[in-house]
């Protein structure tokens, strides 16, 4: 049975980890694309492909002039340098795989950011994603299953992927600096509703406890400026 990841954002793969105080960060990689020829991936490995369905619930989006996680060292998100551009307290849910290349009318409160130069866009979302899809390699089509693996027969089934840890056996609540070539890096943090990261010892059965959000944040190679003429 094959295992492969469906992500629109770069796939995040963990190796070693490093720590600041009581919080732990994994080491990010952008992953390897699934191959349409044999082998699709290395033995016992994983690969990334674009899904047919990728449902995400978004609570907030914004832009910051300074890193709100201070180089992955902050326990809580510091939004003092940030401008919020979208908010929905109950969350806006959408299938973003189906929306590729189209405009999405998001339900919530939209705001113009304050004038300034921004390097750190962020998104606060639910740490639960609904995905399905298929991928054909060397003449065999693999379909997603409800358990998160893949099968070579049947039809693609939905899988609810809940991110509860970026490593283990302790709680790894940070996933820093996956590279997006020509754009910058992307990091992710598992947080509670107050945007506080789980401590390394906040873990049960291999999962970080008290988590119900994920913050995705980019560090842009080229910051952008909002002015009165924008």
Q: What is each model feature region?
A:
Residues 1-2, 21:
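Initiator methionine at the very start of the polypeptide chain
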Residues 2-9:
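Sec-dependent signal peptide recognition
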Residues 20-230:
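A short, solvent-exposed, low-complexity linear motif enriched for acidic/polar residues
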Residues 14-16:
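N-terminal signal peptide c-region/cleavage motif recognized by signal peptidases
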């Amino acid at each position: 049975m094959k295992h492969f990841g469906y992500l629109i954002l770069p796939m995040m793969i963990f190796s070693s980890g490093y720590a600041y105080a009581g919080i732990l960060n994994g080491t990010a990689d952008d992953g390897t694309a699934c191959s349409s020829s044999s082998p699709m991936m290395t033995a016992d490995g994983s690969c990334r492909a674009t899904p047919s369905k990728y449902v995400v619930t978004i609570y907030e989006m914004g832009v910051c002039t300074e890193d709100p996680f201070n180089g992955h060292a902050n326990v809580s998100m510091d939004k003092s340098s940030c401008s919020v551009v979208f908010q929905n307290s109950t969350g806006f849910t959408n299938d973003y795989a189906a929306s590729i290349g189209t405009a999405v009318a998001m339900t919530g409160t939209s705001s113009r950011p304050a004038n300034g130069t921004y390097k750190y866009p962020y998104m606060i979302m639910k740490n639960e994603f609904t995905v399905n899809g298929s991928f054909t390699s060397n003449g065999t089509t693999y379909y997603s299953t409800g358990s998160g693996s893949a099968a070579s027969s049947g039809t693609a089934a939905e899988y609810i992927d809940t991110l509860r840890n970026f490593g283990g056996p302790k709680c790894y609540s940070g996933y820093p600096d996956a590279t997006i070539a020509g754009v910058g890096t992307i990091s992710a943090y598992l947080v509670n509703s107050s945007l506080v990261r789980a401590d390394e010892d906040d873990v049960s059965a291999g999962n970080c406890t008290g988590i119900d959000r994920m913050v995705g944040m980019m560090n842009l190679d080229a910051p952008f400026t909002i002015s009165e003429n924008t």
